[in-house]
From Swiss-Prot:
Family matches, as HAMAP family: ManNAc6P_epimer
Any one of the GO BP annotations: N-acetylneuraminate catabolic process
Listed name of the protein: Putative N-acetylmannosamine-6-phosphate 2-epimerase
MF GO annotations: N-acylglucosamine-6-phosphate 2-epimerase activity
Pathway: Amino-sugar metabolism; N-acetylneuraminate degradation; D-fructose 6-phosphate from N-acetylneuraminate: step 3/5
Keyword Isomerase annotated: yes
Cellular component GO terms held in the UniProt record: cytosol
SUPFAM superfamilies named in the record: Ribulose-phoshate binding barrel
Described purpose of this protein according to its UniProt entry: Converts N-acetylmannosamine-6-phosphate (ManNAc-6-P) to N-acetylglucosamine-6-phosphate (GlcNAc-6-P).
Pfam families: NanE (PF04131)
Species assigned in the record: Lactococcus lactis subsp. cremoris (strain SK11)
Keywords attached to this entry: Carbohydrate metabolism, Isomerase
Family: Belongs to the NanE family.
Length: 234
């Protein structure tokens, strides 16, 4: 699948993030949970899946026929980048044949000592046809990553780094700026409701990822519990 085909596939649709990390209720040492989430997403009309880890990606590929944005989350402390942070993770993801690989493209110090531009260059030299999505937190990072050779940028890390503004809703301002700059953008982060998804779509993004509002029942249930408990009893 090339860049144009992927963009056409996700246009006007929802990419569902199906992830669970150790310590979370839906995480299982034996696997088997995320492909069920992906199957439900496909039946609902999702156009693609975002998944973490080689195991989950392979299981999801067997369960659905949707393209996958693959990542591997691994800490390399004391550095803060943990989403597909080194070539080791890139190699492992390429071996799964996932359509897109997403990686941290912030300008923070990296574990491998490379700048993000050098890292992107090495990936493109090694895997020239592999589609890349840049997980970024602000416009400068997005602009830099796109000029360095990634295929799409994502607002995945907006609000989660020291270099971005903390907020409870999607970063509409950043999305608008990226669309205006004609940088292919996949909206991601804090899209909590269908109304917010509609607003994001109207901005003109190329695609959007929704995770917590769909595939994290702990967060969803907590939201309802807090709302009900905040109401004063008659």
């Amino acid at each position: 699948m090339n860049k144009e085909q992927f963009l056409e596939k996700i246009k006007g649709g929802i990419i569902v993030s199906c992830q669970a990390l150790p310590g979370e209720p839906l995480y299982s040492e034996n696997g088997g949970v995320m492909p069920l989430m992906a199957k439900a997403a496909e039946q609902a009309g999702a156009v693609a899946i975002r998944a973490n880890s080689v195991r989950d990606i392979k299981e999801i590929q067997k369960a659905v026929s949707l393209p996958i944005i693959g990542i591997i989350k691994k800490d390399y402390l004391p550095q803060k980048s943990f989403i597909t942070a080194t070539m080791k993770e890139i190699d492992e993801l390429v071996a799964t044949s996932c359509e897109v690989i997403a990686l941290d493209c912030t300008l923070r110090e990296r574990h491998d000592g490379l700048t993000i531009n050098q890292f992107i260059k090495k990936i493109k030299e090694k895997y020239p046809t592999q589609l890349l999505m840049a997980d970024c937190s602000n416009f400068k990072e997005c602009e830099n990553a796109y000029s360095a050779g990634v295929d799409f940028v994502g607002t995945t890390l907006s609000g989660y780094t020291e270099e971005s503004k903390k907020q409870d809703e999607p970063d509409f301002e950043l999305l608008e700026k990226l669309v205006e700059a004609k940088i292919p953008v996949i909206a991601e982060g804090r899209i909590h409701s269908p109304e917010q998804a509609q607003y994001v779509q109207k901005i003109g993004v190329d695609g959007m990822v929704i995770g917590g509002a769909i595939t994290r029942p702990l967060e969803i249930a907590s939201c309802f519990v807090q709302a009900v408990e905040s109401v004063e009893k008659l």
